[in-house]
């Protein structure tokens, strides 16, 4: 679950709302003032496709240790030339 790696995730399939980075459960509870999840023994399934790619990207980003790099080479991405980025942006900007 994204909650276990520090993200609150609201499904993209129900109109994307937000992805919020939080470092501990106290921050999340003070923000929403409610219990975050109901724990059950059922298996969680993520639909394949664009949503799965987005979640995989978030997981890879959280697994990478950004602080270990001294400097980054900035790469500019033109969504018109990269179909993957174009698809992600179309999902995020869909109303």
From Swiss-Prot:
Domain of life: Viruses
UniProt induction comment: Expressed in the late phase of the viral replicative cycle.
Disulfide bond entries: none
GO CC, one annotated term: virion component
Keyword Aminoacyl-tRNA synthetase: no
A matching Pfam family: Pox_J1
InterPro entries: Poxvirus_J1
Subunit structure: Homodimer. Part of a complex composed of A30, G7, F10 kinase, A15, D2, D3, and J1. Interacts with A45.
Magnesium recorded as keyword: no
Its job: Late protein which is a part of a large complex required for early virion morphogenesis. This complex participates in the formation of virosomes and the incorporation of virosomal contents into nascent immature virions. J1 protein is required for DNA packaging during immature virions (IV) formation.
Family to which the UniProt record says this protein belongs: Belongs to the chordopoxvirinae J1 family.
Keywords: Host cytoplasm, Late protein, Virion
Annotated localization: Virion; Host cytoplasm
Entry's transmembrane regions: none
Positions in coiled-coil regions: none
Protein name, per record: Protein J1 homolog
Main location: virion
């Amino acid at each position: 679950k994204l909650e276990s790696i520090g993200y609150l995730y609201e499904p993209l399939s129900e109109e994307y709302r937000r992805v919020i980075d939080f470092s501990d459960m106290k921050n999340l509870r003070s923000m929403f003032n409610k219990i975050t999840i109901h724990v059950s023994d059922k298996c969680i399934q993520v639909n394949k496709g664009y949503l799965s790619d987005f979640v995989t990207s978030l997981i890879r980003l959280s697994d990478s240790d950004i602080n270990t790099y001294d400097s980054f080479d900035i790469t500019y991405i033109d969504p018109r030339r990269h179909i993957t980025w174009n698809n992600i942006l179309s999902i995020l900007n869909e109303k």
